[in-house]
Amino acid sequence: MEAVIRKWQQKFRKGKEEMEKWEALQVRWVSLFRNASSIIQRLQEMQNHGSYGALRCLKGIEDAVVQQQMGQLESLLRSMKNVMEEFWGCVLTFEKLHRDGLQLREIESSKRRVEERIGVKPCITDCLEGLSILYDMHQSEYHLKSSILSVLSCLILKPSPGDLNALQYLVVDQPNIPKDEVQHIFDVIFAEEIK
Protein backbone atom coordinates (compact mmCIF):
# COMPACT_ATOMS: atom_id res chain seq x y z
CA MET A 1 0.00 0.00 0.00
CA GLU A 2 2.85 2.40 0.80
CA ALA A 3 4.27 1.89 -2.70
CA VAL A 4 0.90 2.84 -4.18
CA ILE A 5 0.74 6.01 -2.07
CA ARG A 6 4.28 6.92 -3.19
CA LYS A 7 3.09 6.70 -6.82
CA TRP A 8 0.28 9.10 -5.97
CA GLN A 9 2.66 11.44 -4.23
CA GLN A 10 4.84 11.48 -7.37
CA LYS A 11 1.80 12.63 -9.30
CA PHE A 12 1.24 15.42 -6.79
CA ARG A 13 4.90 16.46 -7.03
CA LYS A 14 4.40 16.78 -10.79
CA GLY A 15 1.22 18.74 -10.06
CA LYS A 16 3.19 21.05 -7.75
CA GLU A 17 5.70 21.67 -10.56
CA GLU A 18 2.82 22.56 -12.87
CA MET A 19 1.42 24.93 -10.26
CA GLU A 20 4.79 26.66 -10.01
CA LYS A 21 4.82 26.98 -13.80
CA TRP A 22 1.24 28.33 -13.64
CA GLU A 23 2.29 30.94 -11.06
CA ALA A 24 5.18 32.11 -13.27
CA LEU A 25 2.74 32.38 -16.19
CA GLN A 26 0.32 34.25 -13.94
CA VAL A 27 2.95 36.92 -13.23
CA ARG A 28 3.46 37.41 -16.99
CA TRP A 29 -0.30 37.35 -17.62
CA VAL A 30 -0.97 40.08 -15.02
CA SER A 31 1.80 42.28 -16.43
CA LEU A 32 0.56 41.88 -20.00
CA PHE A 33 -3.03 42.56 -18.93
CA ARG A 34 -2.07 45.72 -17.06
CA ASN A 35 -0.07 47.02 -20.01
CA ALA A 36 -2.89 46.24 -22.46
CA SER A 37 -5.55 47.83 -20.26
CA SER A 38 -3.39 50.96 -19.87
CA ILE A 39 -3.19 51.33 -23.64
CA ILE A 40 -6.94 50.75 -23.99
CA GLN A 41 -7.63 53.47 -21.42
CA ARG A 42 -5.28 55.89 -23.21
CA LEU A 43 -6.71 55.23 -26.69
CA GLN A 44 -9.85 57.23 -26.02
CA GLU A 45 -7.80 60.21 -24.83
CA MET A 46 -5.43 59.89 -27.80
CA GLN A 47 -8.32 60.26 -30.21
CA ASN A 48 -9.33 63.56 -28.58
CA HIS A 49 -7.87 66.37 -30.73
CA GLY A 50 -7.50 68.66 -27.71
CA SER A 51 -5.04 66.27 -26.07
CA TYR A 52 -2.18 67.17 -28.38
CA GLY A 53 -1.86 70.89 -27.61
CA ALA A 54 1.01 72.41 -29.58
CA LEU A 55 1.78 69.05 -31.21
CA ARG A 56 -1.33 69.44 -33.36
CA CYS A 57 0.75 71.49 -35.75
CA LEU A 58 2.57 68.28 -36.72
CA LYS A 59 0.63 66.80 -39.59
CA GLY A 60 -0.69 63.31 -38.86
CA ILE A 61 0.57 63.18 -35.25
CA GLU A 62 -2.76 61.92 -33.90
CA ASP A 63 -2.96 59.05 -36.38
CA ALA A 64 0.70 58.15 -35.89
CA VAL A 65 0.36 58.00 -32.09
CA VAL A 66 -2.85 55.95 -32.25
CA GLN A 67 -1.33 53.59 -34.83
CA GLN A 68 1.78 53.10 -32.72
CA GLN A 69 -0.30 52.34 -29.62
CA MET A 70 -2.56 49.96 -31.58
CA GLY A 71 0.57 48.13 -32.78
CA GLN A 72 1.76 47.76 -29.20
CA LEU A 73 -1.69 46.61 -28.13
CA GLU A 74 -1.77 43.97 -30.88
CA SER A 75 1.63 42.73 -29.74
CA LEU A 76 0.43 42.53 -26.12
CA LEU A 77 -2.74 40.65 -27.11
CA ARG A 78 -0.64 38.19 -29.16
CA SER A 79 1.63 37.64 -26.15
CA MET A 80 -1.44 37.09 -23.96
CA LYS A 81 -2.70 34.45 -26.41
CA ASN A 82 0.70 32.75 -26.26
CA VAL A 83 0.55 32.71 -22.46
CA MET A 84 -2.96 31.25 -22.73
CA GLU A 85 -1.53 28.37 -24.77
CA GLU A 86 0.97 27.74 -21.99
CA PHE A 87 -1.82 27.84 -19.39
CA TRP A 88 -3.67 25.28 -21.52
CA GLY A 89 -0.57 23.05 -21.41
CA CYS A 90 -0.78 23.12 -17.61
CA VAL A 91 -4.48 22.23 -17.74
CA LEU A 92 -3.70 19.28 -20.01
CA THR A 93 -1.02 18.09 -17.58
CA PHE A 94 -3.53 18.22 -14.71
CA GLU A 95 -6.03 16.34 -16.87
CA LYS A 96 -3.43 13.64 -17.57
CA LEU A 97 -2.52 13.37 -13.89
CA HIS A 98 -6.20 12.94 -13.05
CA ARG A 99 -6.68 10.33 -15.81
CA ASP A 100 -3.60 8.44 -14.61
CA GLY A 101 -5.03 8.61 -11.10
CA LEU A 102 -8.27 7.04 -12.29
CA GLN A 103 -6.26 4.20 -13.83
CA LEU A 104 -4.31 3.72 -10.60
CA ARG A 105 -7.56 3.52 -8.68
CA GLU A 106 -8.90 0.90 -11.09
CA ILE A 107 -5.93 -1.30 -10.21
CA GLU A 108 -7.09 -1.26 -6.59
CA SER A 109 -10.22 -3.36 -6.90
CA SER A 110 -11.38 -3.37 -3.29
CA LYS A 111 -13.36 -0.38 -1.97
CA ARG A 112 -11.89 -0.98 1.48
CA ARG A 113 -8.36 -0.74 0.10
CA VAL A 114 -9.18 2.52 -1.74
CA GLU A 115 -10.25 4.10 1.56
CA GLU A 116 -7.56 2.46 3.73
CA ARG A 117 -5.12 4.72 5.58
CA ILE A 118 -1.70 3.89 6.95
CA GLY A 119 -0.86 6.32 9.73
CA VAL A 120 -1.08 9.90 8.48
CA LYS A 121 -0.65 8.91 4.84
CA PRO A 122 -3.60 9.74 2.59
CA CYS A 123 -5.93 7.09 1.25
CA ILE A 124 -6.35 6.56 -2.50
CA THR A 125 -9.70 8.37 -2.40
CA ASP A 126 -8.00 11.48 -0.93
CA CYS A 127 -5.42 11.38 -3.70
CA LEU A 128 -7.93 11.01 -6.52
CA GLU A 129 -10.19 13.73 -5.12
CA GLY A 130 -7.20 16.05 -4.75
CA LEU A 131 -6.13 15.55 -8.36
CA SER A 132 -9.71 16.01 -9.52
CA ILE A 133 -10.06 19.29 -7.61
CA LEU A 134 -6.72 20.63 -8.89
CA TYR A 135 -7.69 19.76 -12.47
CA ASP A 136 -11.14 21.39 -12.11
CA MET A 137 -9.66 24.53 -10.53
CA HIS A 138 -7.10 25.07 -13.25
CA GLN A 139 -9.51 24.26 -16.06
CA SER A 140 -12.07 26.73 -14.65
CA GLU A 141 -9.41 29.41 -14.23
CA TYR A 142 -8.23 28.83 -17.80
CA HIS A 143 -11.78 29.35 -19.09
CA LEU A 144 -12.11 32.53 -17.02
CA LYS A 145 -8.83 33.87 -18.43
CA SER A 146 -9.98 33.00 -21.94
CA SER A 147 -13.21 34.95 -21.37
CA ILE A 148 -11.27 37.89 -19.94
CA LEU A 149 -9.06 37.98 -23.04
CA SER A 150 -12.17 38.02 -25.26
CA VAL A 151 -13.76 40.83 -23.24
CA LEU A 152 -10.50 42.79 -23.28
CA SER A 153 -10.46 42.60 -27.08
CA CYS A 154 -14.03 43.95 -27.16
CA LEU A 155 -13.16 46.82 -24.81
CA ILE A 156 -10.74 48.22 -27.40
CA LEU A 157 -13.72 49.54 -29.34
CA LYS A 158 -15.57 50.93 -26.34
CA PRO A 159 -13.31 51.26 -23.30
CA SER A 160 -14.81 51.43 -19.84
CA PRO A 161 -12.47 52.11 -16.90
CA GLY A 162 -14.91 50.37 -14.53
CA ASP A 163 -14.94 47.22 -16.65
CA LEU A 164 -11.16 47.25 -16.96
CA ASN A 165 -10.79 47.60 -13.18
CA ALA A 166 -13.22 44.72 -12.57
CA LEU A 167 -11.35 42.54 -15.06
CA GLN A 168 -8.03 43.43 -13.46
CA TYR A 169 -9.38 42.29 -10.09
CA LEU A 170 -10.31 38.92 -11.62
CA VAL A 171 -6.95 38.63 -13.37
CA VAL A 172 -4.96 39.23 -10.19
CA ASP A 173 -7.24 37.31 -7.83
CA GLN A 174 -7.55 33.99 -9.74
CA PRO A 175 -10.84 33.19 -7.96
CA ASN A 176 -10.99 29.61 -9.22
CA ILE A 177 -7.73 28.62 -7.51
CA PRO A 178 -8.17 29.35 -3.78
CA LYS A 179 -4.70 29.09 -2.25
CA ASP A 180 -5.94 27.80 1.11
CA GLU A 181 -7.83 24.93 -0.53
CA VAL A 182 -4.81 24.02 -2.67
CA GLN A 183 -2.57 24.09 0.41
CA HIS A 184 -5.02 21.83 2.27
CA ILE A 185 -4.88 19.27 -0.55
CA PHE A 186 -1.08 19.18 -0.41
CA ASP A 187 -1.12 19.05 3.40
CA VAL A 188 -3.32 15.93 3.26
CA ILE A 189 -1.21 14.22 0.59
CA PHE A 190 2.14 14.99 2.23
CA ALA A 191 1.01 14.87 5.88
CA GLU A 192 3.95 12.69 6.97
CA GLU A 193 6.42 15.26 5.58
CA ILE A 194 4.91 18.17 7.55
CA LYS A 195 6.94 18.84 10.65
From Swiss-Prot:
Protein's organism: Arabidopsis thaliana (Mouse-ear cress)
Signal peptide: none
Any one cellular-component term (Gene Ontology): nuclear envelope
Alphabetized InterPro entries for the sequence: CA109-like, OPRN-like
Domain of life: Eukaryota
Residue spans crossing the bilayer: none
Organism ancestry: Eukaryota, Viridiplantae, Streptophyta, Embryophyta, Tracheophyta
Name recorded for this polypeptide: Uncharacterized protein At5g43822
Record-linked Pfam families: CA109-like
